[in-house]
């Protein structure tokens, strides 16, 4: 018999492609709550046929993620010991319940677990960090209209579950069009919330609103609560990229250097600066900073990770930089490393063949 009653709760809209895979990983729970917020595909019919699913339907107007999360949480049985909030494009690895129950006790309010946010082209985790959406029944509420936060209403007692792994398989065809206005609303409601000011600046970058990105992230860096160096460094990198896209090369380089100073233990700012020098055909500085990036061996468990700093791309750029710097043996060494990661890339193979002619 199980020690605890565990309930999974989720919101759903047009997830027919993901429901079965999600359900099969969640059915270790005692109860599964789904709030459908207006599906027009076959989601509702699929959900109705699945045992354990308790389906509710309600449109949230105006749309806010925190309102939808809180509504779905309200349907979780009051005698639940542990609540698990997931999205329907996420899948737990088998055995998650056993690991959770073995670590949980009545004094715990929340658990963090490993989250593979995305995967590289070879199916390996690319961005991994700890997520914290497992919690007790009555001490939490959701806040913020997007990039919603699970807020504790009392003193927290958090445990770490490194053996519980949740994998995210994002549908790249799904629109993010609501994110920007919701982030603007979130920052309007909470102008001193450093986390969402950072997210808003990043979103402006995604939309190529370079001036808005720079202004917003300047504000992020000024906030007294913006103390997490990883995120501060990321804000500086996004500002640098925006300056670069505006044609202000010196400002871009300055902010990449600031990002390095802020978090010298991260690979990403070195890589980004090396990449800018590469694009500007300054191969001496490109080689220098890409080699500095490779000295950072440990990938941080935060969402800040950038795939290109850790896959074949960094070796590809470094091999070309070394080649133009007439360091042919090193160029071949690094192109081999790139090919080892991506054996199917014909351009890399062609570069290797070409570089060998100079390895005399």
Predicted regions span which residues?
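Acidic helix N-cap motif at the loop->helix transition within catalytic regions
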Residues: 17-20, 41-49, 95
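A conserved acidic beta->alpha catalytic loop
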Residues: 25, 35-46, 60-62, 87-91
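Catalytic-site signature of metal-activated, phosphate-bearing donor transferases
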Residues: 66-73, 91-219
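Active-site nucleotide-sugar/metal-binding loop of Leloir-type enzymes
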Residues: 70-82
